[in-house]
Each structure stands twice: as C-alpha cells, then as structure tokens.
C-alpha cells in the first residue's frame, strides 16, 4: 500500500513541501532564515491574538489596556514582551534573509524575489501600525510624522493624509483603523508566504556555490528538518532571553508616557529596524525628495535582479563584490546609528554621505564590480 502522505490530497502538499522536497546537499545555515521567519510569524500571530482579546482600540483606554494586560492578565506581561521583542527578531531574520539573497544571487529567481520584496513591505507596514497601538508618546508622534509624509504628494497629498487619519489629525479614528489593519495584515502575509514558497518550489533552492544543484539533491526530511530545529531552538533562546531579562532594551522610554498631542518628544524616532530608512528620509532637506528616497531605499530591491552583471551567480568566488557587499552592510549599520541621533552636525553630513553611498553601491559599484570580475576571469592569452 502506498504511503498515506503521498496519496492524501492535503498531506501530499505537505509532503512535497516539507518532507520529500529535494534540497541541495550543500546549503548552509544562511538557508535557515526562511523557516525561522515562519516561526516568527506564527509566534506573532499567536501572541497578537491573545493581546487582541484584552486590548481596546480607543484613545482614552488604549494605553491603560496595555498596562492592564501587563499587570492583571495571566502571563500578560510575557505575551506582550514576546510580541514586542518578537517583532525585533522578525526583522533581524528578515534582514539576514534578504542579505543572504543578495550575497548568493538568489534574486535571480525573480518571482520568488519580487514576492519577497512585497512581503518585506507588508511586514514593515504591519510593524508600523502595530507600534501605534499602545498609544504612548512615541506611538502617537511616530504615527503623526510618518502619515504626514503623505501630504508631500503633489495635489492629492493632504486629502490622502486626512483620508488615512479619518479626520484632521491622528486621533481615535486613526487608532481604530490601525488596529484593524494590524489584525488583518498578518493573515495577508501568511497568504503571501504560501505564494513565495510556491514560486520557490517551482525552481528549487539556490545554494552557496550558485551552480545548478540538480546533480546532488537530498530529501528535506530528516536532513533539513533537524537543521531547522537547531535554528528554532537558537531563535527561541534569544527571544526568551530578550523577553525575560531585558524586555524594554529595544523600545523607546518615551512610550511609557501616554500620548499627548500638546507635548512633542525631544527626538522622534521609529523602532531600530526602521532607522536606516528614517536616516535616508532625513538626509534630504526637501520633504517630497525625502519621501521618494525613503521609498527608493526599499523598492531598489526590485531592480537588483536587473543589475546583475557577473557571469557567476553567487559572490562566493567574487572577492571584489564580497568587499562591496560588506561595505554595504557596514553602511546600513551606520545609517541605523544615524537614524537614532538628533538632527545636528556631524550626524547630518554622515547620514547624507551614507545615503549617497547606499544608492551608489547598489546602482553603480556592484554592477561595475561584476563586469570587472568577468573581465578578470577571461583568459588573457
């Protein structure tokens, strides 16, 4: 009798995706982040669901309801800390996952890559609306500053901003709709993840060498299920350590004060995972220019497949491209640092230089490095 997992209509899908899936034999720990992101998403949906049972999306009670969750609900403090720090783990895994894709040339699977970029944007939108919900000072002013950027759009900008606000400023209507968005978006993300996997399984996984791995494939289970399990344990160890020992280290102290439209915090800044984009936004003195640069900093990922000039897919054997990649990584860390600093010298000029370098590396230097490496590989006799 044929095994049930190979014949049952539902189990067959699971079997082809997670059990009998042919996987390259040489994929490293950098390929763990897809499954880690899946775990992060599940943790966020579960903890978020339990938080939503006790949260009230009203300007008068939102802040108090979060305090109530932490003080009075059974393990509410733990659920909230897991949810808040789970977002940080989510973005850490996301950035490493995207970085892996750039380093090893995974972006040449264009459909998978494009769905991935859409996923990144959706997760960023979810995190942004979620940060507004506790209705602390930074929640309110972060929402005010970022939604206000819509008003930079010519002609329709202000109408658009007021439409998003549901009034003439960030208020009760804004909070209620942001809660609705924050609840629905993770399920949209889940649907997109399935599409992302669908396109990935059309081509199969890339591997560190960047060459066709079809000659040497191994079944996903038990090899990569065990390998992923190690990743899960490490992720949960880090998340629990954060949530239990230092739950507020990645948050902003201003968010412990209830939202007050009459008092502006000294430095308005988003959570750490948005600081690089915030630094690029602030580096341009013009409002519309800043908004366009902010969008370009993320949407530039969509054109990376078309900027691939090298004959080799992966950077594994391309030392010049490798050097530029690590300069890009250091540059993003610099931007993250600058995004959290006040708008004064020398931070302004450092932010502007780092922003210019960010776009130069992706648009000019890395494609040129690929061409130069092609030239160096040609026989010279």
From Swiss-Prot:
Transmembrane segments: 33-53, 77-98, 113-133, 178-198, 226-246, 288-308, 320-340, 347-367
Binding site for heme b b562: 83, 182
UniProtKB keywords: Electron transport, Heme, Iron, Membrane, Metal-binding, Mitochondrion, Mitochondrion inner membrane, Respiratory chain, Transmembrane, Transmembrane helix, Transport, Ubiquinone
Ligand binding (heme b b566): 97, 196
Membrane topology: Multi-pass membrane protein
Cofactor annotation comment: Binds 2 heme b groups non-covalently.
UniProt keyword annotation of Heme present: yes
Binding site for a ubiquinone: 201
Function: Component of the ubiquinol-cytochrome c reductase complex (complex III or cytochrome b-c1 complex) that is part of the mitochondrial respiratory chain. The b-c1 complex mediates electron transfer from ubiquinol to cytochrome c. Contributes to the generation of a proton gradient across the mitochondrial membrane that is then used for ATP synthesis.
Subunit structure: The cytochrome bc1 complex contains 11 subunits: 3 respiratory subunits (MT-CYB, CYC1 and UQCRFS1), 2 core proteins (UQCRC1 and UQCRC2) and 6 low-molecular weight proteins (UQCRH/QCR6, UQCRB/QCR7, UQCRQ/QCR8, UQCR10/QCR9, UQCR11/QCR10 and a cleavage product of UQCRFS1). This cytochrome bc1 complex then forms a dimer.
Misc. comment: Heme 1 (or BL or b562) is low-potential and absorbs at about 562 nm, and heme 2 (or BH or b566) is high-potential and absorbs at about 566 nm.
Family from the record: Belongs to the cytochrome b family.
Protein name: Cytochrome b
